[in-house]
A protein has these predicted regions:
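Aromatic-rich, lipid-facing transmembrane alpha helices and their immediate juxtamembrane interface loops
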Residues: 1-214
Length: 214
């Protein structure tokens, strides 16, 4: 694993991590409550992007911590994972006025965005990832140089960018509808028509608008 990670490599880490995170969260929800809960961050596709960013970040530092004692690796992974989770929560709240997780009341919670138990979970996931997934990913990147995977990356990147842009627009209008703000142009009318409140609640069933929760 080299010190530099190319964009196609980072994208595939983000892409696969987002999908794996979607199913990991769903399965964990089934174990805890007996029912599935959608944790996708996009209107189309099973993409829990906080895990995508986390996967890319964990892979990026795996080489840097490989020579450290296990406990130092654990702490480094835990810190990086917590930073990703905190940043994701902060951006979601300030961009869309909503949260998808809130650890308020848990031990050593910081603004409800992270807590000790989830930070430790990131550390454990990092250790497991560095031992199992990172070597497999590195092997794939080394062998995939003979594949047209850069072209595949370009196509998937364009599709993901479109999905994220559409999702952001739909979320923005959903937020505005909470205040009965009418659409201002044809694009917003189309967003309201195709992504009404009922559909958005079905997609983002764990999302709560902060001021509406009070």
């Amino acid at each position: 694993m080299g010190n530099k990670t190319s964009y196609p490599e980072l994208f595939f880490l983000f892409f696969t991590g987002s999908i794996l995170g979607f199913f990991l969260e769903g399965i964990w929800r089934v174990i805890r409550t007996g029912s599935w809960e959608n944790h996708s961050a996009t209107v189309y596709g099973p993409f829990c992007i906080i895990y995508g960013f986390g996967t890319a970040a964990l892979y990026r530092i795996t080489a840097d911590v490989s020579g450290m004692p296990l406990w130092q690796q654990f702490l480094r992974f835990a810190a990086v994972g917590a930073a990703v989770e905190y940043t994701g929560s902060f951006l979601q709240e300030h961009l869309f006025g909503s949260v998808s997780w809130d650890y308020t009341g848990r031990f050593l919670s910081l603004n409800g965005r992270i807590c000790l138990s989830m930070t430790l979970m990131w550390g454990l996931l990092g250790i497991l990832y560095s031992r199992i997934c990172a070597p497999a990913a590195t092997h794939f990147f080394e062998t995939a140089s003979h594949w047209p995977y850069r072209g595949i990356c370009a196509v998937l990147s364009a599709a993901m960018a479109a999905d994220l842009l559409l999702s952001a627009g739909a979320l923005y209008r959903w937020r505005e509808r909470q205040y009965d703000i009418p659409p201002r142009n044809h694009i917003e009318e189309e967003l309201d028509a195709h992504y009404d409140n009922a559909r958005m609640e079905e997609i983002y069933n764990n999302m709560v608008f902060q001021d509406r929760a009070k």
